[in-house]
Amino acid sequence: MTHHRKVRSALTVTALLSTAVLVLTGCTTSTPAPTTGAKGPDLAAAKSFLAPWLATTDKKLLIDQPLSGSIPAGTRIAFLDVGTPVAAVMWDILQPIVKLTGIKLDRVSTGSDAQSINTAMNTVVESKYDGIINITLDPIFFKPQLQQLIANKVPIASGSVMDTVENGMPEAFNGPDWMKSEGQALAASAVVRTNGKVNDFVLYTIPEFPFAQFQVDGFKSKLKDLCPACNLRVVDIPIATLGSTSADQVVSDLQAHPETGYYVAIADEGTVGLPAKLNLAGITVKGLGTWSIPPNLQQVAGGTQDATLPIDFNLMMWTVTDQLFREILHDKYKWPDAQTRAYTLATLLTKDNAGNYPNGYAAIPDMQKQFAALWHVGG
């Protein structure tokens, strides 16, 4: 796939450059501007598409069959930590699983450059783990070690990795089609939040994340369906700026493009602190994001950020771990369709309901109890 190769290429270059180079000004692409008198967004269609994401009941675990047996005593698992704020959140989410199941979980810091990843993955191979949890780390960075892990029959359960099957790994539940569905939901959310009255949008993406381009593609396709005449700019925000200067880059971009009516961020963590900066700059443009962390939800609950389409990180990490347990036990399983997987883990939150989730969105309130039953633990 052309887009996938482009993203891989960008990620490879990024890994070889210094952090200073990564902070260079992001690139911008745009779709044609709307013609005078063109019809605006189809609000009814946007609401209809988004309906499954907004459901507050009937969301179920993606796999609901019990494990074929107990998790082997002494099971050792490595968590690959890529060093982002979200990765830190996901590590914390795994701790109750350790307590519940008794597994041994090691945190392996991979870094973000080729050399550090190579060193970390060599250690993983030498440590002879029973399984690996990988969130976002592209296999292109550890091909030799991956081949050794596969040869040693060490299963790898992945989250937000786009080419698992192609690289001989179990299929990630949130692969390319899942990401496209999330991108479509973001576009529909933007139309809904602007009440179908905005025609100029900007989408901030992280080019170093292999999954981001699939979300961009989904966003573009759905926005074109909902509003063929709308104008969309796609702006790159370097991964190295997340948590530091990413919000400043958004401010600068909006200052340079006063025609923009609404923004959407693929990595919402990059907009933490943005509302105050926008206010200081006298910018009134509102927006939403996804892959949101608790500070984003706090901004939404406080009314300073318009909305968010958060992913249930708890459900995501427990699902990835559940998959790994099934791989370790050689259990057969099948994922539901991509859109079902997508809307199960996400919803649209606004000031009216974001305060209900101070620690992050929870799609299935009794999720831990349900997983414990599937794993034959905890009671």
Segments predicted by a language model, with ranges:
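Beta-alpha junction/loop-to-helix N-cap segments that form part of ligand/metal-binding clefts
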Residues: G111-T164, A172-D177, D268-P275
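Hydrophobic alpha-helical segments within soluble ligand-binding/sensing domains
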Residues: L62-D64, F173-F201, Q213-F214, S246-A247, ...
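Hydrophobic alpha-helical
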Residues: I132-A151, F219, I239-Q299
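An alpha-beta-alpha
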Residues: R76-F79, L94-P96, Q184-C227, L232-D236, ...
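Bacterial lipoprotein signal-peptidase II cleavage site
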Residues: L24-T36
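Hinge/cleft segment of the Venus flytrap/periplasmic-binding protein
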Residues: T36-G74, M317-G379
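Flexible loop/hinge segments that line or gate small-molecule binding clefts
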Residues: T36, I140-S181, D200, I293-A301, ...
